[in-house]
């Protein structure tokens, strides 16, 4: 699998709510947000629709070939761009003002319509979507408001499995073939890397994120753990357990929890947090880690490794691991 180049493009807290909600009654007449909703209207003619089952089991009628997609999670944005569809709205990435750093160039012209904490309904309305990819949004009141704007599909289930989400997004966007092709190429690339790891296959790999709040490790049940599992790696200490949240904070006294045969550590912010990470590397407690002493510690882009993740992020992780571990 060559370095990823996306196909040509076409054009969970309560959200910010404003006077734009007054327009939703009119929008409801032309939106198709559930199995009981009429097909959407385009230039006076009924558009072709298809029914999909989202990550919650809800059946949703969506346009057969959506052209105005709003992506309400990093994984939705990653998937859409991977499949050759440029959204008309996105939510800012974790710790970012806009798209996740690794997608910034591809998404530089896409308006921000919300944050990790939730969508801004007014901005979603202004984007005039014909379908909304709602990520892992679980607030039923928010979902009801979004469904008045356009058909809304929850794309991420409780497992947060990026592969399942990509397949569902491919179905919603009419790009199932592209999704299947990507997953096949990813599988081939992962299998090749696993073979080339040689004696390092089965090593314990630690993944940590550093910020002004301190150090956190990535446990089971998140994106990066699934990618590492594809490669057959072990996880050290508490990282082999399922965490309660997206990441698990550590006190300075427990810094040894980030140790392993190999350590990959990153930050979300390329500015302040990256500077803090550079300072951490100078501390004796960090320098005493086995992975550091063995020169098995690598600084990575935290937006790829330690956030919600997605298809392009997964390929980047494989590339980083190959560069660090295959000699």
Regions found by a protein language model. Give the residues of each.
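Proline-aspartate-enriched helix->loop->beta-strand connector
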Residues: 128-134, 151, 255, 260-263
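Basic- and aromatic-lined ligand-binding clefts that recognize polyanionic substrates
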Residues: 68-80, 180-238, 243
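Structured C-terminal subdomain patch of bacterial secreted/periplasmic proteins
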Residues: 261-327
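Short, low-complexity, disordered segments immediately C-terminal to signal peptides
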Residues: 15-23, 32-51
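Extracytoplasmic substrate-binding proteins
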Residues: 141-212, 308-327
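Extracytoplasmic ligand-binding site segments that recognize negatively charged/polar headgroups
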Residues: 96-99, 139-141, 157-168, 202-227, ...
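Sec-dependent bacterial lipoprotein signal peptides
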Residues: 1-30
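A short, structured surface patch at a secondary-structure boundary
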Residues: 68, 76-123
């Amino acid at each position: 699998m060559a370095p990823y180049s996306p196909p040509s493009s076409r054009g969970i807290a309560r959200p910010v709510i404003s006077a734009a909600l007054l327009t939703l009654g009119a929008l409801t007449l032309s939106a198709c947000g559930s199995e009981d909703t009429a097909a959407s209207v385009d230039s006076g003619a009924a558009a072709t629709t298809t029914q999909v089952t989202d990550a919650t089991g809800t059946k949703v009628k969506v346009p057969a070939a959506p052209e105005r997609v709003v992506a309400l999670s990093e994984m939705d944005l990653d998937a859409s761009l991977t499949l050759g569809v440029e959204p008309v709205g996105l939510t800012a990435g974790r710790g970012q003002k806009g798209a996740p750093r690794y997608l910034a160039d591809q998404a530089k012209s896409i308006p921000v319509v919300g944050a990790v904490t939730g969508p801004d309904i007014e901005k979603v309305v202004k984007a005039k979507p014909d379908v909304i990819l709602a990520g892992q949004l679980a607030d039923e009141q928010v979902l009801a408001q979004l469904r008045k704007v356009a058909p809304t599909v929850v794309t991420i289930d409780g497992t947060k499995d990026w592969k399942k989400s990509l397949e569902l997004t491919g179905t919603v966007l009419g790009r199932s073939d592209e999704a299947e092709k990507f997953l096949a190429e990813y599988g081939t690339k992962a299998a090749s890397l696993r073979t080339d790891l040689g004696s390092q296959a089965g090593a314990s790999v630690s993944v940590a994120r550093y910020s002004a709040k301190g150090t956190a490790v990535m446990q089971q049940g998140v994106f990066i753990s699934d990618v590492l599992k594809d490669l057959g790696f072990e996880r050290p200490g508490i990282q082999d357990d399922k965490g309660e949240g997206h990441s698990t904070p550590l006190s300075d006294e427990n810094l040894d929890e980030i140790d392993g045969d190999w350590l990959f550590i990153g930050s979300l912010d390329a500015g302040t947090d990256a500077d803090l990470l550079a300072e951490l590397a100078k501390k004796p407690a960090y320098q005493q880690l086995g992975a550091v002493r063995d020169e098995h510690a690598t600084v990575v882009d935290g937006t790829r490794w330690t956030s919600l993740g997605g298809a392009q992020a997964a390929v980047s992780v494989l590339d980083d691991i190959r560069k660090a571990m295959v000699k």
